[in-house]
Amino acid sequence: GVDDYSGGYQIGNYLYSCGYDKAIFIAETDIDSDYSRWVGFKQAMEQDGKFCSRTRLVIVSYEKKKRLQKYSELLPRFLEVKALAFSSDYDAIEAMNFFLDQGIKIPDQISITGYDDSIYAQMVRPKLTTVHQDVSQKAHLALSRLLRMAAGEQLKEMNVKSPVHLVRRESVKEKNRPLI
């Protein structure tokens, strides 16, 4: 699989470094890859002795109508914290469209990040800041391991992590970020 914890940490660290120390993480579940991404995000948000409570993990429905209803209910809170990290590009882009329909400017009023670096992350406006995972490398690793196991080889490590990296685009307002 991919290193979901690292991806979550990279997003959290980036938002924290931009001054969004109260950012919220949004996912459809609190298990598996979503949970690993949340734990990484949470860890990054706890720099400088700060605490990131479970209330900053928002679980949204699989159903679009219910998700949009949740975004509407939480809109004042979202605008207060000014940054949202989504566990998928799909949900991030859907939320961006919802916010734009409400007249909210991205990233000026709210910064948004996704996860996956899907093809749509570059097509949406503003272009989505996200975590890139190399799907072809992931498939290659899986196939290679499968062939080795089929040949009778005993593999020592069953869970190999494919590296991920942050892709900075236009959906985050980089306030308080030092120039490098």
Regions found by a protein language model. Give the residues of each.
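Hinge/beta->alpha junction and helix N-cap segments in small-molecule ligand-binding domains
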Residues: 1-10, 26-70, 85-93, 115-118, ...
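Short acidic capping loops at alpha-helix termini that bridge into adjacent secondary structure
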Residues: 22, 52-56, 105-112
